[in-house]
């Protein structure tokens, strides 16, 4: 077989992690493989020749995207032209669907095999995107099983590869070791995780702290840990803590240690709910959006649940308190019993963890190479 050339594009840190794992698995099977495209430091360390820094693609939020739209479109156009000229054996777009799906469509029209790794949330909203995916994508690699079922129904070639987090997080986390590392005592510990973005923490931070204040009355000797995503979030939360007497430890990052150490979690909807589930920690999920945003999303979103544990269980396994239902009293009263006994949740968490633990990088590499076997 001639030297394999694989093009990949990742747009953010999570994609860089996935991309580097996939590259490692491909190299194990094809030591002479050449990688081109756009990746971050982890992908570059695996041998990626990145055409420009991945950070140029990592923009969050509508306003930021609009501010950089001209640059993003220009980079995408240049990337398409370069890749058509290079003619790689396969192109793999990793997440970042608003950037990569268009590239896949153009490359597939030029006769290049295309793979999309990590499904956008088409099963929940903007379902028409599946038409673009079907047209532009030879193979979809999903991290979650219900996503694969959705694509099968829509006639899109798909492979469920499992979730890399399920591979890296142990089936049974050592609570005592995590507590020792964080300097925590033996009593009940609750993790508060109000999100990693400024807007989320602005809407949920004080609410979670109010709920914690109520939990102090309900659970004797309780202690709280709150991992801060970065310095800006820490400053934001320190301001919210002024004037409060709470037995609380702020952590810098260390969200995985906080989850390993705690007995239960009060958590914002998002990827963190998957992490909490993989650590087998009972949780209550809360979320608040700006009223207009919530009103619009309620009409657009087709999914009955917002949290990944419930989407994976296909039933209400964990309580979801959204918008006006998310009061400090309701959060405290719902979480308190779970601190003492959350087995109803955690037994199912263990089953789901085993379903997702499939050695994702190797599964993905095998699927990509199977697509190329006739090249």
UniProtKB/Swiss-Prot annotation:
This enzyme catalyses:
a lipid X + a UDP-2-N,3-O-bis[(3R)-3-hydroxyacyl]-alpha-D-glucosamine = a lipid A disaccharide + UDP + H(+)
MF terms in GO: lipid-A-disaccharide synthase activity; phospholipid binding
Q: Which EC number(s) are documented for this chain?
A: 2.4.1.182
Assigned keywords, A-Z: Glycosyltransferase, Lipid A biosynthesis, Lipid biosynthesis, Lipid metabolism, Transferase
Record SUPFAM superfamilies: UDP-Glycosyltransferase/glycogen phosphorylase
Q: Please name the pathway.
A: Bacterial outer membrane biogenesis; LPS lipid A biosynthesis
Single GO cellular component term = membrane
What InterPro entries would the database entry show? Glyco_trans_19
Q: Which domain of life is it from?
A: Bacteria
User: Which Pfam family, any one, appears in the UniProt record?
Assistant: LpxB
Q: Which GO terms describe its biological process?
A: lipid A biosynthetic process
Q: Which NCBIfam families match?
A: lpxB (TIGR00215)
Cited function: Condensation of UDP-2,3-diacylglucosamine and 2,3-diacylglucosamine-1-phosphate to form lipid A disaccharide, a precursor of lipid A, a phosphorylated glycolipid that anchors the lipopolysaccharide to the outer membrane of the cell.
**PANTHER family, per database record:** LIPID-A-DISACCHARIDE SYNTHASE (PTHR30372), LIPID-A-DISACCHARIDE SYNTHASE, MITOCHONDRIAL-RELATED (PTHR30372:SF4)
What does the sequence similarity comment in the record state about its family?
Belongs to the LpxB family.
* HAMAP family xrefs: LpxB
Q: Report the protein name in the record.
A: Lipid-A-disaccharide synthase
- What is the native source organism of this protein? Pseudomonas putida (strain W619)
Q: What is the lineage of its organism?
A: Bacteria, Pseudomonadati, Pseudomonadota, Gammaproteobacteria, Pseudomonadales
